[in-house]
Amino acid sequence: MARDVLTLSRHVLQQFSGFTPEAQDFSALMNRIALAGKMIARRLSQAGLIEGTLGVTGSVNVQGEEQQRMDDYANRAFIRALEQTGLVCRLVSEELKTPARLPENCSLSRLALLIDPLDGSSNIDANLSVGSIFSVLHPLEDRPEADNQDLLQPGRRQLAAGYILYGPSTQLVYSVGKGVHSFTLDPSLGEFILSKSDLRIPERGSVYSLNEGYFCQWSEGIQNYVRYVHRRDGYTARYSGALVADFHRILLQGGVYLYPGTRQKPEGKLRLMYEANPLAFLAEQAGGVATTGTEAILDIVPQSLHQRVPLIIGSRKNVEEVLRCLEGSLTP
């Protein structure tokens, strides 16, 4: 029997139980996020054929990182998909020092979209998977709009979160706090079609994902965790350099992803508000755990839009093993 074809927009409406104004706005917003994803997926599929797709721009972004050409394209794709729609007022991006106003005269009380437009962009020249990460927030009414203080809120207040994975197929995974659902782009239809609903992270998995090249810069607790998994059967290392791709594997198969702080940079590398928070929201919705090692990611009150944090995320039992190594109760 043929399965029902459930599109992303129809699924969002079902999540909100009807055609309420809120449901229609969210459905429209998810469609615009999906549109940006389609634009990026098309461009990536032509990488190497279109001049100016591969390589770097020669400039440095607000994070102090060399900007890839596709970083710039992906950021502009989200702006183009959302400007003049009235669905969001502010776009917070890894590539922008201050939020973009869409349009400039919009009401700041409208929703805000926070994005990493292209995570893992250094993978593109090698034709490896990359992704986009997004979070939707409603500004806090009791916080001043000046300096975007109204957006500095814990991740538990996210209205929606998700990512788009550009791999052998293009997949969009999202949650509005009612489970985690995955959609696959059907290029012939130009639609994201529901492929998996109510995803659950296995309680334990065999995969541990981290860049062991930083081993000597980590704390003794993280080093001990690596020694622990090296000395036991049942663990396998998988690390692609793209957060979305590595997290997606763990969402489906179980395990743990780690990007800890180093002795030189204890605050870590990943951005809280548009990388760690969205994935932590998905992880908890799917029965997993996300922590800095001392605090739940979703409980952190941000101090700035581009704040960085360490991240340990994945299956409950795998994360517990890491935490026990950090506290010293589990030794190699």
From Swiss-Prot:
Classification via InterPro entries: FBPase_C_dom, FBPase_class-1, FBPase_N, FBPtase
The highest taxon in the source lineage is Bacteria
Which cofactor names does the annotation list?
Mg(2+)
Question: Which SUPFAM superfamilies does the entry link to?
Answer: Carbohydrate phosphatase
| Enzyme class label | hydrolase
Which GO terms fall under biological process for this protein?
Answer: fructose 1,6-bisphosphate metabolic process; fructose 6-phosphate metabolic process; fructose metabolic process; gluconeogenesis; reductive pentose-phosphate cycle; sucrose biosynthetic process
Record has Metal-binding as a keyword: yes
- Which residues does the record give as Mg(2+) 1 binding sites? 94, 116, 118
Q: How is the cofactor bound?
A: Binds 2 magnesium ions per subunit.
User: Which sites bind substrate?
Assistant: 119-122, 211, 239, 257-259, 269
Q: Where in the cell is it found?
A: Cytoplasm
- Regions annotated as coiled coil: none
Q: Tell me the NCBIfam families matching this sequence.
A: PRK09293.1-1 (NF006778)
Please state which protein family the record places this protein in. Belongs to the FBPase class 1 family.
- State how it assembles: Homotetramer.
Q: What is this protein called?
A: Fructose-1,6-bisphosphatase class 1
Q: Which organism is it from?
A: Synechococcus sp. (strain JA-3-3Ab) (Cyanobacteria bacterium Yellowstone A-Prime)
